[in-house]
A protein has these predicted regions:
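Membrane-proximal intracellular helices of multi-pass ion channels
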Residues: 1-445
Length: 445
């Protein structure tokens, strides 16, 4: 017993997080395989159940079966629970239940909780976890109440379940919808393109869920005093605003020409918000221009913010790389923002994460394109959606073969935990050698 305990203690935080996600995915897949999880009462093939489970836990939204028509009420509930666990994080959920039971949280557990939500320090982590969980449920409840009249007006009493499901799915940046029928599969929110309440509610839920729990805490503590926010919170909020407004303006002038002005504004904003990293869509994505799809791919790869329900390489990674490039152009040794320097190791970690995401995105797209005989651009859209844990699709995912689906499963999983794992691997267990190799310059650019 002592040896088992010793081994558990040796597991680093990032390994616990990675194994926690994997455990929930496998358990969810086994449950979804059961006949009572599908409306037809049949056993779902393991690879399809695994794909759905991975997509839910990694809060992606890519599916191989229509969620609304294929899965039973029980199956949809299981998917929703996995979305909630995946959005909050396995460690955060486990820690919250431990606190509810009155158990004392050890220092090692607090350290793991700190890593799971990207907190700057261990102190106050229990208070922060309570704040996150309570805030999550409150925001999801508000989102549900706002959407209730619209969904109940169309679906009657079933509208309560519809509002709850889509509120949680939006806040957790999952992108799963249950609006599909046997006659109209995979509709997402295309039927609500001109409905202001649903559009605005979903967009706000996505944004709030995607800015990160620490940013919430900063806003809650300092209210609207922007100057008092942490540098990270400032960078997140400004970067998020830029990555919403700039693409929305581009989409407005390049797409949706046939829509009335109000719907065109809503459609442009919605398609700008959702690629980071929610996966809902109100517009016909294949009909959008090639340049708009390229911008959406970039947005999908960037994703949300650290310590949030969103995936992707993160807004801070993107911002650090841009700031670093500006510092080079200005012939400065360090990247600077809001009167602070950004540490060189942070820039290296950002570059490492960005390279990893781009390699996964590109290699995955090439393999799927080769295996399926599909255009590379279409396959790259799907792999960006998978590795960014977004869920947007040009409609090819349900038709892909098992090999291609397995590739997307791996991309979704690595997209959710891969960047985190690489960063922790880079900053932990460093072997500082006294002797160093000779330095030699290499020309770049």
């Amino acid at each position: 017993m002592s040896e088992i305990t010793h081994r558990k203690k040796r597991l680093s935080s990032f390994k616990l997080i990675v194994l926690g996600f994997a455990s929930v995915i496998v358990l969810g897949a086994l449950i979804l395989m059961m006949p009572f999880s599908s409306t037809a009462g049949v056993v779902t093939p393991f690879h399809e159940a695994l794909f759905t489970s991975t997509s839910a836990v990694c809060v992606t939204g890519l599916v191989v079966q229509d969620t609304g028509s294929y899965w039973s009420a029980f199956g949809q509930t299981v998917i929703l629970l996995m979305i909630q666990i995946g959005g909050l994080g396995v460690v955060t959920v486990a820690a919250f239940f431990a606190m509810l039971s009155g158990r004392k949280i050890s220092l090692m557990q607090r350290s793991t909780m700190q890593d799971a939500i990207s907190a700057p320090k261990v102190g106050g982590i229990v208070r922060l976890t309570r704040f996150i969980v309570r805030g999550t449920f409150l925001i999801e409840l508000i989102g549900m109440i706002v959407m209730l009249p619209t969904f109940c007006g169309k679906f009657g009493i079933k509208g309560i379940w519809m509002a709850a499901f889509h509120s949680i799915s939006a806040f957790c940046n999952a992108g799963f919808d249950i609006l599909g029928t046997a006659e109209n599969k995979y509709p997402s929110l295309t039927g609500y393109i001109g409905e202001p309440t649903i559009n605005i509610a979903i967009m706000l839920l996505i944004i709030v869920g995607g800015i990160g729990f620490l940013t919430w805490d900063d806003i809650y503590t300092n209210k609207w005093h922007f100057k008092k926010y942490r540098m990270q919170s400032k960078v997140i909020l400004v970067t998020t605003a830029i990555l919403i407004i700039a693409p929305a303006v581009f989409f407005f002038f390049c797409d949706f020409m046939g829509l009335p002005l109000g719907e065109r504004i809503l459609a442009s904003l919605f398609q700008s918000v959702t690629p980071r990293t929610a996966g809902f869509n109100t517009a016909d994505l294949p009909a959008m221009t090639g340049s708009s799809k390229a911008i959406m791919i970039l947005l999908m790869l960037v994703g949300g913010s650290p310590g949030s329900t969103a995936g992707g390489m993160k807004t801070t990674t993107f911002a650090v790389l841009i700031l670093s490039a500006f510092s080079v152009c200005r012939k400065k040794d360090d990247a600077e923002v809001y009167g602070r320097r950004i540490d060189g190791s942070t820039v290296k970690n950002a570059a490492t994460v960005a390279v990893m995401y781009f390699l996964l995105f590109f290699i995955g797209g090439i393999v799927i394109s080769t295996a399926e005989g599909l255009p590379l651009s279409t396959c790259l859209y799907e792999t960006a959606s998978a590795v960014g844990t977004v869920g947007l699709t040009l409609g090819i995912t349900p038709q892909l073969g098992i090999l291609s689906q397995l590739i997307l499963i791996v991309l979704m999983y690595l997209g959710r935990v891969g960047g985190l794992t690489l960063v922790y691997a880079a900053i932990s267990n460093k072997n500082q050698s006294v002797a160093k190799l000779p330095l030699e310059k290499i020309t770049v650019g």
